[in-house]
Amino acid sequence: MKKGYFLQTCDTCNRILKEVNTNGFELQEIKSNPVNAQQLEEMHQLSGSYEDLFNKRARLYKSMDLKSKNISEAAYRQYILEEYTFLKRPVFIVENEIFIGNSKSVVEALKLKIG
């Protein structure tokens, strides 16, 4: 199984999509087709945490002043399901491994995994 979740208007996502070999991937644009509860649960099982999947750089995170709040795992889950920008991106699932975000180390690990 190879899946990728990205935001089409995100320049970083587009750069990474061009950088890695996405042949054979099922790609999902999260603004036009937001992740559902089942997909998020699959990501959670692989990552071990909703917080790891949560984008703390989202504008809404700042405007809602979420940094000052003590957010539970259940709340992180709900925020991601309600607002696509709260999903850290891109997210790639390759077999039973998950690659979250755009750090160089994550992108390099993804490239090594898919060859």
List each model region and its residues.
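Local sequence-structure signature of Cys/Sec-based thiol-disulfide redox active-site neighborhoods
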Residues: 1-30
